[in-house]
Amino acid sequence: MAKEKFDRSKPHVNIGTIGHVDHGKTTLTAAITTVLAKKGFADAQAYDQIDGAPEERERGITISTAHVEYQTDNRHYAHVDCPGHADYVKNMITGAAQMDGAILVVSAADGPMPQTREHILLSRQVGVPYIVVFMNKCDMVDDEELLELVEMEIRDLLTEYEFPGDDIPVIKGSALKALQGEADWEAKIDELMEAVDSYIPTPERDTDKPFMMPVEDVFSITGRGTVATGRVERGQVKVGDEVEVIGIEEESKKVVVTGVEMFRKLLDYAEAGDNIGALLRGVAREDIQRGQVLAKPGSITPHTNFKAETYVLTKEEGGRHTPFFNNYRPQFYFRTTDVTGIVTLPEGTEMVMPGDNIELAVELIAPIAIEDGTKFSIREGGRTVGAGVVSNISK
């Protein structure tokens, strides 16, 4: 069969499989590609191709992730599947694979298990907005009442972590039987993809979000003003727009963008992904510095106190060799700069070991533009010892 051309006209969505070890995440991923391949919507991937995912490095952290792509009638999907539990934790915290929605795989024969709970909690903390459930291995359970019981358990668990447990689609199927080509079970994969299509909304594109650009460098051009350079993280900025300079200083300042330059050419506007120089009126060279952001006024605010879901690197990953304790004071690297912060451990936690995944409370010594979902690295003397994502802002 001839390879299909990548169809840009379909909206793109990032999803992934989550759930307890051996409940069938990878088998389901293989089954989705195999069933969709029959419609010409995917390249069929065997279990082994997905399971043997190569290791990648994201912010100094080693993660194994398999990436597959496929499409439905309505959309194009990029799908991530991780071999090990630790890979999920790292993946979700570093945002190496940002998910617009997830397929939670639960074995009907076992019901929800510890990692089922952990992955739901992680999804809540790092901001995976939507979950669809695939109850797998239903061919192994003859008792209809037992299936209903497991479904109720899953729904209750989702509700416990503030997902709409009563409304979430739950599809009962068998990934293995679908993979083996049994028509009744293949239909369940179609049903799952219809649920994913309709229940997980198409995400807002980065260019449609409010403008933000982390400042990387600043210099002045005599007679013209101050230029701040950086990569536009989201939204767009036009010549004449008023933007706010946020972070590091106590007070945010409003300035006007009088010019936008890229590759030494003048532009009318710039958008997410562009590396630009923004010419600013009404601000001196010393009033703006690396680590601040330019943003649409009112869209993001500076904070010093927050809670964060973090992963602490192991010794093998180049992290610490020893645990850290309450009042640990590392550097927190947000976007383009390091800021010292003081760590408070959760009640009842004496220390944090390399390899741990934990929610920390942090107080920065200077305010930084952050919001729920902002990613950062934890560093000591320039080397990365952890990664985190803001889960709750307190001040």
Swiss-Prot record:
Binding locations of Mg(2+): 26
Major enzyme class: hydrolase
Broad class of where this protein is predominantly found: cytoplasm
Location of region: G4: 136-139
Database matches in SUPFAM superfamilies: EF-Tu/eEF-1alpha/eIF2-gamma C-terminal domain, P-loop containing nucleoside triphosphate hydrolases, Translation proteins
Region (G2): 60-64
InterPro entries for this protein: EF-Tu_GTP-bd, EF-Tu_GTPase, EFTu-like_2, EFTU_2, G_TR_CS, P-loop_NTPase, Small_GTP-bd, T_Tr_GTP-bd_dom
Annotated keywords: Cytoplasm, Elongation factor, GTP-binding, Hydrolase, Magnesium, Metal-binding, Nucleotide-binding, Phosphoprotein, Protein biosynthesis
Post-translational modification: Phosphorylated on serine and/or threonine residue(s). Dephosphorylated by stp.
GO molecular function per UniProt: GTP binding; GTPase activity; translation elongation factor activity
Domain tr-type G intervals: 10-204
EC number of this enzyme: 3.6.5.3
Region named G1: 19-26
CDD domains hit by this protein: EF_Tu (cd01884), EFTU_II (cd03697), EFTU_III (cd03707)
Ranges for region G5: 174-176
Subcellular location: Cytoplasm
UniProt similarity note: Belongs to the TRAFAC class translation factor GTPase superfamily. Classic translation factor GTPase family. EF-Tu/EF-1A subfamily.
PANTHER family linked to this entry: ELONGATION FACTOR TU, MITOCHONDRIAL (PTHR43721:SF22), ELONGATION FACTOR TU-RELATED (PTHR43721)
Function: GTP hydrolase that promotes the GTP-dependent binding of aminoacyl-tRNA to the A-site of ribosomes during protein biosynthesis.
Quaternary state and interactors: Monomer.
Protein name: Elongation factor Tu
Gene: tuf
